């Protein structure tokens, strides 16, 4: 089916003149003559600049868990906008939200707020390094943790042919501009491979600060952990003094109210949150055990 682009195309042509590929993320570019220009959204629907109506299955790549322009969210956000937006100081609203997260998420003791999922995973890794006085970390192939340099390896968009073998995986850099030396700090392993994780930690635990994992892979049609895999990670991290980080940017407040922690019954040392936390408002958080978080 072909839709009118009488209004959308001129807008996107202007975007191409002043924005790289006319978008704010490469994932949004669908071609010079087919990238949508959205005018509004309500509930599960969006409308483009020409008034064409669509069912929105992307929902902002995950954040819009309550639907676009939810009346309850819009009302509360509008109320707080009238009082100011950024004070560089503690507000009662922060405290209220933090208390709710601590109450909802099993094992959550203390947290910090930030703006994006990228920042949340970046802070979580830095906290783990500070707590353990070690520098390297493990991530899993196909998993996405944002766009800071340390996690831009072996994501779902990486060519499988470049990743090496199952027994000798190779971190595959995503995009350009990442210093070559950073690769030395990352171990990329196959997800759900019990033996690979155990061998890596046994051989390199003296230099590994953290194990960063999406409990359920969001960018690859929702691949779940095999029975016992997350518990296996917990046991190994305890044994080798490694901080277990759940990246719950996608799973948080979605798999269940308490996220993957509640759904799978495994408590990490730190979890990261964004997306569903704000229903499209840029807010994120990372938190976990007080002993670990207090090193910040």
Where are these regions (language model features)?
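Conserved N-terminal phosphate-binding loop of PLP-dependent enzymes in the Aspartate aminotransferase
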Residues: 1-296
